[in-house]
Structure formats: structure tokens, C-alpha cells
Amino acid sequence: MQADPIVKSVMIVLALASLACWTIIIEKLLRFRMIRRQTHAFETAARNGERLTAEASNLAGRIVAAGYGAWRDQDPSESRMERRERIERAMRLALSYDMRHLQTGLPFLATVGSAAPFIGLLGTVWGIMNSFSAIAASQDTSLSVVAPGIAEALFATAIGLVAAIPAVIAYNKLTTDLGRLQQSFIGGIMMLGDHLARDRNHYLRAEAAE
């Protein structure tokens, strides 16, 4: 509490950044867990040729809705391969739109992970400068003169590391998880696109049932 105002400002900024990072991390972990269940159900249903519900309330449902929308817009002159490519393209566009929303917050984690140590270093340098100033003012190199500036300098460094380390680890994990989720959805999209392109009657009955 008795630290220099500059060092104290650095500590406050790093503490707020750490709090924001943990908020993003917890929110992403919970959301990714929910989407992972949707991915598994979507991929399993697409593999087995089961009827999928086009619900706008979840990611898998929006992908299915995009696929059904492209399937309805059929052109008698197009081949099955062309129809499949068009249906898959519509579903991939829906997927990419949601993927961009899921990436929200990840750049902030990357920024904090790379910048927090340097922000903490600013506080460290300022605290050491205060220690040298105290030595010059008192003409004394005892521990009681040097310790306050060194202590606040080291504490600023520690807060920078506390903010940066979880941010870097979480960014790497969440980015990897997001890539895996996207690949799983793409696999389901390919299977669903194939079913929609070649098995018209099955999905026509499914649409009628809805």
C-alpha cells in the first residue's frame, strides 16, 4: 500500500488484467464443454444418417438449418457432387460464423500473456530506481533504505507473471480445443452433406415430420 504511485498503477492494471483473463477462461471452458457435447451428438447422428433438428439455439442446430436451407434450394440441372458441395459450403459458412464468435476473448489472453511480463518489468525498473534514489538521498545503503523499493519491484514482477502464465496456458489450450471442435464439426458436415445430396427422400420425410 505504500508503493510508489507508478508501481501501484502497474499492479492495479495487472490485477485487473488477470481478473479479466480468468473470467474469459472460465466462460470459455464452460462453453466449450457444452459445445463438445453438441459436436459429439452432431457427428454421431450425421454418421448414422439420423434426422437432425435444425434448432437456432445451439451451434449444431444452426449448422443443420443452413444445410437444410441449401438442400431445399435444389437445382435439377446440378449433379450430386455439385449439390453436395453447395450444401457443405452453406454449413461451413454457418460454422465459421460461430467459430468467430467463439474466438472472442482469445486475442486478449494472447495479449496479456505476451505483454504482462513487460508491464511488470516496468514496475520492477521503477521500484529499483526508487531504491537508488533513496540511497542517494540518505547516503545509506542499509537494508531498511533499499528494501522498500526492491520489495515493490519484485512484487510488480510477480504480479506480471501471475497474470501472464495462466493467460498463455489457457490461450494454447483453448485454441487447441477450438481447432478440435471445428474439425469434428467439419467431419460431421461432410457426412451430413453426403446424406443430404444422395438421399433426398429420407430428408424429405424428415422435413415433413418437422
Model-derived regions, located:
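Residue-level signal for the membrane-embedded core of alpha-helical transmembrane segments
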Residues: 10-13, 17-20, 116-119, 123-126, ...
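Transmembrane alpha-helix/interfacial motif
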Residues: 2-47, 55
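Hydrophobic alpha-helical transmembrane segments of polytopic membrane proteins
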Residues: 153-167
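Alpha-helical transmembrane segments of multi-pass inner-membrane proteins
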Residues: 12-13, 147, 155, 159
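Transmembrane alpha-helical segments in integral membrane proteins
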Residues: 21-28, 163-174
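Hydrophobic alpha-helical transmembrane segments and adjacent short intramembrane/lumenal linkers
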Residues: 139, 143-153
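Residue-level signature of catalytic and energy-coupling elements of molecular machines
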Residues: 4, 22, 55, 64, ...
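Predominantly long cytosolic amphipathic alpha-helical stalk/bundle segments
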Residues: 33-142, 169-210
